[in-house]
Curated annotation (Swiss-Prot):
The keyword Magnesium does not apply. Pathway: Carbohydrate metabolism; tricarboxylic acid cycle. One of its GO terms (cellular component) is mitochondrial inner membrane. Gene3D superfamilies: Fumarate reductase/succinate dehydrogenase, transmembrane subunit, Single helix bin. Its cofactor is heme b. Residues 1-29 form a transit peptide. CDD domains: SQR_TypeC_SdhC. Residues 30-65, 140-146 are mitochondrial matrix. Keywords: Electron transport, Heme, Iron, Membrane, Metal-binding, Mitochondrion, Mitochondrion inner membrane, Transit peptide, Transmembrane, Transmembrane helix, Transport, Tricarboxylic acid cycle. This is Succinate dehydrogenase cytochrome b560 subunit, mitochondrial. The heme b is bound between the two transmembrane subunits SDHC and SDHD. It comes from the Eukaryota. Membrane-anchoring subunit of succinate dehydrogenase (SDH) that is involved in complex II of the mitochondrial electron transport chain and is responsible for transferring electrons from succinate to ubiquinone (coenzyme Q). SDH also oxidizes malate to the non-canonical enol form of oxaloacetate, enol-oxaloacetate. Enol-oxaloacetate, which is a potent inhibitor of the succinate dehydrogenase activity, is further isomerized into keto-oxaloacetate.
């Protein structure tokens, strides 16, 4: 808004042969400010008892929606995990072998180790397979609603199978 006003004033000054008194004398004051508009909007909504729009309770959860949220969550978690691992490798004393020996000395059962490995690899596999799904969308493939659900199920099955395979190693 201010840029438009400055452009108008500048053009008017150029037309008036750089006469500053004509520019100031013919300037049009603004009707309302953004703050006044915002206050009027919120007062109107509060007065009519409207909920915030769109209200979160009107959405029904669907597979593509849940998978999109989980894809973002796994991306954040993997990013944080890699950063935490890198910082701990730099700051903690000792080397990787000493920490591996520490874990081996705890005598954890194979079921617990397999479960922990599965829990570590599952977000990576989910983010990888769902990322490939997103790349297919970038190519314009699989964008129809039935295909969204089919590819979602394929991603979940591939995630579980590849996670189990990697955890078994």
């Amino acid at each position: 808004m201010a840029a438009l006003l400055l452009r108008h004033v500048g053009r008017h000054c150029l037309r008036a042969h750089f006469s500053p008194q004509l520019c100031i004398r013919n300037a049009v004051p603004l009707g309302t400010t953004a703050k006044e508009e915002m206050e009027r909007f919120w007062n109107k909504n509060i007065g009519s008892n409207r909920p915030l729009s769109p209200h979160i309770t009107i959405y029904s959860w669907s597979l593509p929606m849940a998978m999109s949220i989980c894809h973002r969550g796994t991306g954040i978690a993997l990013s944080a995990g890699v950063s935490l691992f890198g910082m701990s490798a730099l700051l903690l004393p000792g080397n990787f072998e000493s920490y591996l020996e520490l874990v081996k000395s705890l005598c954890l059962g194979p079921a617990l180790i397999h479960t922990a490995k599965f829990a570590l690899v599952f977000p990576l596999m989910y983010h990888t397979w769902n990322g490939i799904r997103h790349l297919m969308w970038d190519l314009g493939k699989g964008l129809k609603i039935p295909q969204l659900y089919q590819s979602g199920v394929v991603v979940l099955v591939l995630t579980v199978l590849s996670s189990m395979g990697l955890a078994a190693m």
